[in-house]
């Protein structure tokens, strides 16, 4: 689609953006060359990283002041002192800081630590409960960790038992299997093994820390050059400098032979200069102390009589692993002598070098970078540069532990800032559910103070109820108190309006400071104790027995009875369809398929002489169901219960600033049984009679519509000082969902006969099967794999994590508690619930105190069997906190996001757009434009390098920046995820001339998943597959495994729908006879056959898993070689030539059916914004005269960046359930309802080749039924229109908040600039798709124009150029 541009003269903003693009390109080229010193095809990773770290030091030396050096050295000194205080590596479940003295070649610990299993800890707790003397077993404090505490636990070996505090516990040995009830075992290996603890010490970034540091510092250097006003410290420089000083300090402490005089400290500048030269400096006394030998003490595996595993030490493992993964011919000696304490591999944990003094180098270096990003993201806020230095100081003292403690210090300050006396602007009244929000004239400025927050916080601290006492208490923390007080004093009386809304960013940063810690992991072996509250632990620690019947059951029963009245009687046929619906999910579960294959087969490498075997293993639902559906729905599997001998598998989930969590996977037979109940629960909770009580069930994925109740409730709180929102914090609700709660559900199921043929097919009725399953959850057994040889089995009485009904069932529990609270307190309330989240809107009676009321609610919750910490832990008050969103004065605030990823996500090749989208989202949540600009530049520079197996390729700037390239985003400000239309329309105004003349390099394309899967299953009739359903392996009486071919045949017979199958058979030969003689290329049309749908789904699922997980690097390599980006092998003499295409520009027109659209910008028609409270929005015409004046419209997105909130101030927002989007009408041709291997595009392509008289037969050949065919034939004439709309949708994107823009002013403007005849085309009621497309593209272009104007603005007066569509009929 290329468009002849150039008719529009550039505006000043576009000239500035053009200049910025030239600057970006210069930064791109210069920084990339410095960042990637090895420009040849073949690279050595570790040498590259050392060069990068040294260059980062050189940049820091040029930038740093002595004051910054002193601050960085002082932080590292404090860290070193803290390191010497911890001689027990098992004092917490997180990876410890271990010191290796300057004289030691290896870190002084190798033996695994002794660990208590859940079974062992329960026995100790039970012993203490039954021992009046308090000598046997353990108390509550000792039960927090899974390690055996060397200081408080008395351990004796007694044969096959270990006596811990007087309790005999069976110990683990290599001969035990998981069915043995083991009380004492050992942790996973510290290092070396596949599941070694060392992986806890790293965080997952898309690029190496060395690359990230040097890129950020280079960008700071270039921006600071000649600009005295550039705030280098506000961009996180001191934090990064601290990281460099730390790494250099480890090296110096390990290698230095000389000492400074007493009380003489080292200069940071001298330290970095010495590191660059490789000449160790004289070190001060604190470094000398830091590097002295440590005597670590903990209970080891041999201390409890377990034979030591003889694991490798960290230094030994690192050396072997690094040599093993070094490309042939590389300089291995220099790798081992590296000055940097660690090098990062493309996958897996980092390697420690001889320069490493401690185990914390990778983690502390990450913390320095993470807090630098946060510092840059708060540069627009007063006091936060110092705050994030304090955050770094705190996190670095005990790296690896969760940063939740910071939130406990900073979050109260955020809460208080939203409660102190100030003036705020809100609508005079709340809006009806679907109306546009009000103009500014309908707003009022209100004096606001939240005394409820004051009372609750003071009661939590147990101090007098006044602001002075609260302020003194909040700032007691020695390290953080002074900077928090400064921030508080700056903002506590800040007046808030659309032009002055930084307070929302302040609250956002303070609330989620712990996210700077990233995704924290902990010792896997202790998770059964640390990560799960067992039945015994709940009784011992909280006095709650989840088996006992309670008063709340009667309230829950009311809801379950109502749900059962809506349940549709399940049938065996329906169960199959529910299973097929589950197969559309790519999520994992408890069931798995495994088979052996060869890498060369997967890659289609027929010329490879050596075998490269690998095991294809998948627990994704789509692959398991496609291969084994017939094994899932049968009388045996549907009644299967877990046991110690055959437990169910677990997974893990990490959340920023939270402990690692266990996931209790549930087998597919259980999930299919739950489907009818799940649908009934959803239908019940969507009933309008509930007055939106079940909030999430009503959500449409439309941000304003879904938030309207929160917004209105928070506005009501401003107008009514007696109205309060009580956020009941039942964060442990899942852990208390035990037998009692399930018995209520079982009783409700048995009260209503709902069976419909289940007994005939499966031997038991649906009710009996459900009772068996739910009762089985009372003693569910799950295996947790600690490492390759050891797994712990846990007895779990809570609901499995994978249960479809978890959220809805928890909601019923929450509803029961709220109903019980209403009955007991006799205070009317409107509550809103989802899962364990609940808040209630109520007016506090004159004779009641809010603190007393909340304490009463907590007691009632305890009586209901739940722990509710509303007083101390929740955000109750005159703001509304629900589902991670805080709404204050009608304004929404979402939590910040961690910079790292939960799982390894090293950038390899392809689209960096997803990274940029995440970083822009971070910017919109309090991050500011400086942070987004830095992250955008840093990302495109680093993502320009593709690398695999020691070969690399660099993308040129045009391929990244041009429309149709690899990004399609405006490289400044807060760009939309897709700005291809705007970039195409303004391409010649903003791109440097030499860029305009360049093509873009094609994005490497990995093999299609279905082709990969077909290759892997090509020998399906002899390929044996291990299928595990519910923990049991499928095999015949002789123990033989089934073949893939047999599995897929049987699965298809189970999954196929008879009506589709009959119609397929009826028309099969007609279609095949026509296809054999037709003069059209249908490709391999046999793959379209309905009879092959299950095999096709299996091939696609298995191919996807293989390409994305098992063989990702090899498929990346193949794609890059095929695209001409890298050579076939290392050492190749000739450099490949990549394939280029023209930069993708729009044609003169875009087609929407018979209508053509051309977009242009008229430079003389614009909106004018002046950022103060006295001016409205003005629309100017070509004669430079104001023709329309608009008042600002209030909306709930003042926390968003200026470009977004001012656009919405012009349009306003609505709360309707529909949004600005080009509907994907091609979905009408999608076969996703009955087969997963084909897409709508496949069907549309087929229909365009098949003559009209054969279309019905062709569709039945694919598997469509008669009704679907009849409906589809109505749309076949519109295929080209739907394709046009689909292509249009690929040219624009916008933020979710912008999608809710009201269109009345947009429509008014379009009527103003278009002739009546032209507008008539747009307003044709027969063409709703055209009108929708124009509106979407207009608002998308307008949002991009707002972004550019605000990003390039030099004053508070902004002019926004307006896009204009030109429409005509296609003759």
Swiss-Prot record:
Chief place of localization: virion
Gene Ontology cellular component annotations, sorted alphabetically: virion component
Catalytic activity reported: RNA(n) + a ribonucleoside 5'-triphosphate = RNA(n+1) + diphosphate
Keywords: Hydrolase, Nucleotide-binding, Nucleotidyltransferase, RNA-directed RNA polymerase, Transferase, Viral RNA replication, Virion
Superkingdom per UniProt: Viruses
Family (UniProt): Belongs to the reoviridae RNA-directed RNA polymerase family.
Function field: RNA-directed RNA polymerase that is involved in transcription and genome replication. Following infection, it catalyzes the synthesis of fully conservative plus strands. After core assembly, which consists in recruitment of one capped plus-strand for each genomic segments and polymerase complexes, the polymerase switches mode and catalyzes the synthesis of complementary minus-strands.
Record-given protein name: RNA-directed RNA polymerase VP2
Native species: Micromonas pusilla reovirus (isolate Netherlands/2005)
Primary gene name: S2
